[in-house]
Amino acid sequence: MENILDFTLEELKEWLISKEEKAFRAKQVFDWIYNKLIFDFNNMKNIPYKTKNLLSDNFYIGVPKVVKKLMSQDKNTYKFLFEYNDGNIIESVVMKYKHGNSICVSTQVGCRMGCKFCASTLDGVIRNLTSGEILSQIMAAQKEIGERISNVVLMGSGEPLDNFKNVTEFLDLVTSDTTLNIGQRHITLSTCGIVPKIKELADKNYNITLAISLHSPEDLLRKEMMPIANKYSIKELMEACDYYINKTNRRITFEYALVKGKNDSIKEAKKLSTVLKGKLCHVNLIPVNEIKENSYEKSTLKNIESFGNILKENGIETTIRREMGADINAACGQLRRSYVSK
């Protein structure tokens, strides 16, 4: 059986026609799934009994079940553990803002990139998520909170560009007016920096925001924090970023997790200013998530502000990420890891 969420409207129409069914039934089915959030063919009232049986015999609606849900005290952040049909578990986080609800979705079960500050990668990657499985996190979360989600961040477990085909198919699906109709400018894709795939993404010319996990302006330290840096130097990464900016005319966000005594000095701030000078970019400073598997500690607020001020003085737009749901916000991957290890 196939997950119907992996299908576009046109693909479902073609399939129905091949089974001597009416093509317009595809639009009705999509309306039930994406607008009414009905995930059982038998509950689709305007679909004939024969067609329901045909769909049920060939497809499943692959929305994961909620195995754990945490809500912050201020009720602005929800953390979900979702379980797919094969028993694999991933995390998603919903954040409520005045301008709308955002969701951070996972693109893989686990991750193979090995970044030292991330709990998602500690057990390696189990498998890629399909386009429909990524999409289904949004739908499951919308049903749980009873509100529309209008912004998507691909920043959960997994490296999106390590699952390039499925992730780009997801981008095509989620932005379609036949599904969730989320605008491309409301989507951010975060990568550790797979250089060839950044260029390939640029060639697709999406209007999404690309976020690069940088975390150091120096190759030696970046290699220590992020194994991907052993394959691609900062020079190569910056060249790929320039290609992306020139191709899409979109500003890149550089994410920089500040670790006390490691990458938070004035020297590093000045070096980062030099590396990014003249680029159409924005820097997002992040107090590092502390996980027990490493000794990284959050930089002090004073250091973070001083670091940011150096960047601003050099003409680089900089913000400090607002921490939401601190009372439930274990580092990305920790909730899943603690649940799976039980």
Curated annotation (Swiss-Prot):
PROSITE patterns, alphabetized: RADICAL_SAM (PS51918)
Cystine bridges: C104-C332
Primary subcellular site in the record, as a coarse category: cytoplasm
E.C. number: 2.1.1.192
Pfam families per UniProt: Radical_SAM, RlmN_N
Residues given in the record as [4Fe-4S] cluster binding sites: C111, C115, C118
Any one Gene Ontology molecular-function term assigned to this protein's record: rRNA (adenine(2503)-C2-)-methyltransferase activity
Record's keyword terms, sorted: 4Fe-4S, Cytoplasm, Disulfide bond, Iron, Iron-sulfur, Metal-binding, Methyltransferase, rRNA processing, S-adenosyl-L-methionine, Transferase, tRNA processing
Protein name (record): Probable dual-specificity RNA methyltransferase RlmN
Species, as recorded: Clostridium botulinum (strain Loch Maree / Type A3)
